[in-house]
């Protein structure tokens, strides 16, 4: 039996910045990456770093219509975040790794099919791009997404609303209580 290996990909997108005190900031990932590095986890033979490449236009356009134009919307940071997921999924499906963890930003679950710009700090729906990649490249059909975030993954839900082969579960704050 092959030993379990975990694929790890990291895209901090330090150029994707809101106000200095905004919670969705590069510091969130930089701090986490620093803790992972200090802990020695990266030295374990069971960890494999997976290099991210920007998601290609075909992968993005399998999900999104970018207005006013593709390059104005699909900039490097969101393309790298989506591409990291694609690389990690390819590594898993090829058997190179057993599972994976993607430490990426910007987030994506608020982005709808038609993308006019940032919506809830999301430009491209990373997970929707991944789903279409899995279907097109790897011929996977039935897929489940479990979105755990303080906010509802409304963009992902909207994209897959009429898809009978996709189960979408969003566990989020209801507004009357603390998360969840």
Q: Where do the protein language model's features map onto the residues?
A:
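HDAC/HDAC-like amidohydrolase catalytic core signature
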Residues: 1-180
């Amino acid at each position: 039996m092959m030993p379990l290996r975990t694929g790890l990909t990291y895209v901090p997108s330090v150029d994707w910045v809101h106000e200095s005190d905004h919670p969705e900031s590069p510091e969130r990932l930089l701090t986490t990456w620093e803790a992972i590095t200090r802990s020695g986890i990266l030295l374990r033979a069971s960890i494999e770093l997976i290099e991210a490449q920007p998601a290609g236009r075909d992968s993005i356009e399998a999900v999104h219509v970018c207005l006013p134009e593709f390059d104005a919307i699909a900039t490097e940071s969101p393309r790298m975040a989506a591409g990291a997921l694609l690389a990690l999924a390819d590594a898993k499906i090829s058997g190179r790794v057993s599972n994976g963890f993607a430490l990426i930003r910007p987030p994506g679950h608020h982005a709808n099919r038609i993308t006019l710009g940032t919506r809830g700090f999301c430009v491209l729906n990373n997970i929707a791009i991944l789903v279409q990649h899995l279907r097109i490249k790897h011929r996977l059909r039935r897929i489940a997404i479990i979105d755990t975030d303080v906010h509802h993954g409304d963009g992902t839900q909207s994209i897959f609303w009429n898809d009978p082969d996709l189960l979408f579960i969003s566990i989020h704050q209801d507004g009357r209580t603390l998360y969840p």
